[in-house]
Amino acid sequence: MFGFLSKLLDSNEKEVKKYRQIVEIISALDVSARKLKDKEFVSHTAELKVLLSQGTTLDDILPRAYALVREAANRSIGQRHFDVQLVASIALHNGKVAEQKTGEGKTLSAIPALYLNALTGRGVHLVTVNDYLARRDAGWMGPVFSLLGLSVSAIISDQSFIYDPSFENQEALDWRLKHLRPVSRKEAYAAHVTYGVNSEFGFDYLRDNMVSDLSQRTQRGYHFAVVDEVDSVLIDEARTPHIISAPDTEATHKYYDHAKLVEKLSGETDFVIDEKLRTVHLSDHGILKVEKMLGLGNIYENDFQIVHHIEAALKAKALFHKEKEYIVKDGQVIIVDEFTGRLLTGRRFSEGIHQAIEAKEGVSIQQESKTLATVSLQNYFRMYEKLAGMTGTAVTEAEEFKKIYDLDVLIIPTHRTMVRKDLPDSVYKTTRAKYAAIAEDIGESYKKGQPVLVGTTSIDKNEIISELLRRKGIPHNVLNAKNHLQEALIISEAGKKGAVTVATNMAGRGVDIILGGSRKETWEEPDKKKWKKGEEEWQKQHDEVLAVGGLHVIGTERHESRRIDNQLRGRSGRQGDPGLTRFYVSLDDDIMRLFGGEQVAKLMTIFKLPEDVPLEHSMVSRAIEQAQVKVEGFHFDSRKHLVEYDDVLNKQREIVYKRRTDTLEGEDQKETIILNIQSEVENVVHMYSDERERMIDREKILTEFLSIIPFDSASADQLLKQLEQLQTSDEMSSFLKSLVRDMYLSRETQVTPEVMRQVERWVSLSVIDSLWMEHLDAIDDLREGIGLRGYGQRDPLVEYKNEAFIMFERLMTTLDSEISHRIFKVQVNMNPENAQSKGVSLSEKETAVTKALKHMKKNDGAEKIQPVQSNKQPGRNDPCPCGAINPETKQPYKYKKCGLINAPYHKK
């Protein structure tokens, strides 16, 4: 890793120097840009678009485009790009990760690159980490794009907006949100520039591949994306697949039963926890104990579902802790993001873990779910033709960015020299001694008026520090996922003189703490006299905080990742401000306990240090950093492994979604379906024929044929007589294949070609969706158990690839077979008058084929397409409201299995 970093740093300087030369060209165009009238910016944008259409490249027009943006930003929002911000933006245009320190203005840096690439008319995306930032940045930068003649939008959970200067939201408290007008998802994606949350881009991609009509699609391609906080999105969240699911079966008491059962198990004798791998399993003693409590023999042979539920309950008990991995709010278990400290409302742990936690906490258990569609962020963002990113901390993960995403990291110089002091770690033997030292340090800073930001890793530790400060009589603000609604207010005051803020990782990323407190912009205070007075007051407070040393950042423990620690440090020392940072560590901290605290413990023993005396030495800092490098390497391998496995499913997903898109686009499937049915029939004939023995089982051939094309008993008898007159399997196969084609064409004439194309599309979509869903479940089961192959000296990944390939081949074969078996079972009820008006003769000459067609079964195996009258949405396992009957069971189709599940008739 260190060799990789040294190469990176060597090439970094050369690249920055090259980009600075381009910035000089941009700066030379400043004079002409300043002479432009406001209305002329739009015409210059139009000129650049024309140049592109004539073959000029983006690189050719970059200096002119960037000069326009620089001037437009200065005029519209009063912010002019620094040279280093233009360097960062050139890096973004070239598909790199730009590492910019806190306060260097990443939001503004992205604008020139977004503008330049949006000139192609293909749409560009700015990806953020939460709803607030997506809306804020779209509204904040909206005036810049508007002056340049481009549209800008924002997509967040369940809502979309477009920047519209003529629209005003009177309820918006933040001036940057006032001109965001609600629009449809499709209109938001049609904008030149779209800001949005990473998860919503992924979910919209999945939803677009589940629609029943092309007009329902929202996204329009994957041209260029700039990912803000790129390390958080592409690395921290990469291990979490994005899943769209639907309720499967009703929740039962089994989770409560197993939660009670594991409460009787002891961690000392009954189960084994591996905190590094985050796994837990029963010991031999525990297995015997569980079998005795359940009154069963071998639970691993009797019912694997029991083992699954017990292990889920064990994980809920041993690995998932309240106020750390989740909180309970309003009777619901809500996940807390381990990297950002924010609530992930609406997301759920998979594999029954969430239900097991709900049972543990005694709240209502929500239904289990079945995966409808899934994609990892790694594979979603790799679909973009060009990808770039911004963050304050990328260099430690440069190797991963290169190997997985083929992204180079460029370290952007700061606008002003960094003067912050980063003190060495203070290491204590116990957590108690560490907390006492932290409280003492906070007290000293508070006395002299220095603002303090205390970073904790979880809500419970956040509240422990808060209680210590309360006892010492130190006023403070607490920021965690429980009171996230006050975040903006708390952060705006965190830089004031004497302010003490205790926060989780929420304050470690994307947060700008301004010394002296947040200042009012001219947009917020239109009265210039009042604004000037407020500005003078702010400057006075700002200078007072500078005099006492700037923001003091205290980390209460080291995180597994150096990036998260660096993010916390980065809240201090913005834009050349002074600042101070220090981390406090104890031997009880997770990282010391799991990844290398033994070396530090030995040092403390050698020096014979008492509990309340810290160890501060470069050897200690190196030991802690080595522990973090170990963890980062472990997680890198895990994510690389995830990509290798997910790539297998990704290729399959692309093939299935391509087939689904072709179906939606109205590709004529008639000939393909006829050939598939003929192939099915041919296979049936050969299956029940033995030419050598001169044995042909005509009755079984007929039975199988009728499962594809259902006849009434009289027509079936007539068909059997015809089969008995044929001597060889080839004759029989040829006759039945001809019959299939004639019946298909006759049916098409009967219902009209337009309706037949709709039937083909509905049946194909429903079969694809249903079987793809089952395939995802099967692949998930394969993935879970494949690791055991390693014990047999076989490579699990190779085994997974081989078996997944076989399963996929089976899926594609089954798709064709299912469509063949369903297409003739759809009976279209047409109004005779309408049929006549469309030129369909209802009294056409009856041939043997049309006679057989008229006698097809009308109930058994025939699905009648008709409007659903009930307003109640049926459950997945309820009988389908369309009344379709399964010919095999003679029972109504379940809603989830019905061939018409995507037909508009199923909608209210």
Task: Name each model feature, range by range.
Residues 1-608, 657-658, 675, 679, ...:
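Conserved P-loop NTPase motor core
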Residues 64, 84, 136, 460, ...:
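A generic structural signal for residues located within well-ordered alpha-helices
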Residues 81, 871-874:
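Residue-level marker of regulatory loop/turn positions in helix-turn-helix DNA-binding domains and
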Residues 110, 438, 864-867, 875:
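Active-site-adjacent structural elements in folded domains
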Residues 327-334, 340-347, 575-576, 583, ...:
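Extended, charged helical/alpha-beta scaffold domains that provide interaction surfaces
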Residues 449-462, 665-667, 692, 721-724, ...:
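Short, Lys/Glu-rich amphipathic helical modules
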Residues 454, 502, 772, 808, ...:
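Hydrophobic, well-ordered secondary-structure elements that form the walls
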Residues 874-880, 884-908:
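A short, cysteine/histidine-rich metal-binding "knuckle" motif
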